[in-house]
Amino acid sequence: ITYGSFRGFYRAIKEKFPQYDVGIIHFDAHLDVEDEYLNMPEVWHGNVFRKLIEDGYLDGGNLYTIGPRGVIYSQWFKYVQKKGINLYTSNQIKLKGIKNIINEIIEKNKNKKIKFYITFDIDCLDSSYIFGTGTPQCNGLTPYEADEALRTLKKLEVAGMDIVELNPKLDDSHSSFVTACELLYHFLALGYNGGEKD
């Protein structure tokens, strides 16, 4: 979803705001910069950001990945370093606080002309809150931290958002679906408008 959506976002921003660059705020338990893997298609959920970078839609320095944890293979980490991707691990979030992390991102971009796209992989949230995803991970964000991050990100020029990796069929309680809906509702209720004047 993110690969196609962001390509459309990129084209729309470049057409309407040619003076602006584009960036992504990426909430995820994983880096999603893998290369080829077994018999996976050319674009799959594990390589989305590598493809966007390699296909010329995204500068690695404008990608902010928030919440990765667990095993990070050396070749993926080397790719992150090579492309200048901004990485904020789950452990860093626990030590610094999500609001401080987001404020760091805002500070880095305060003098730049960038329209941001938020992509929220639901497995960024801790597995004790989210059951309806194919790759749950412990030690993730709480729903409160996610909501606080969205509230704080309003200081940036955010013009688009998606929520991915949600599979309600894996959660009989439907709590994962409700949580995802709440996050999207809060995003809309906060009145994000890409920095446009009301």
Give the residues covered by each predicted segment.
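Conserved alpha-helical scaffold segments that buttress catalytic/binding sites
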Residues: 1-198
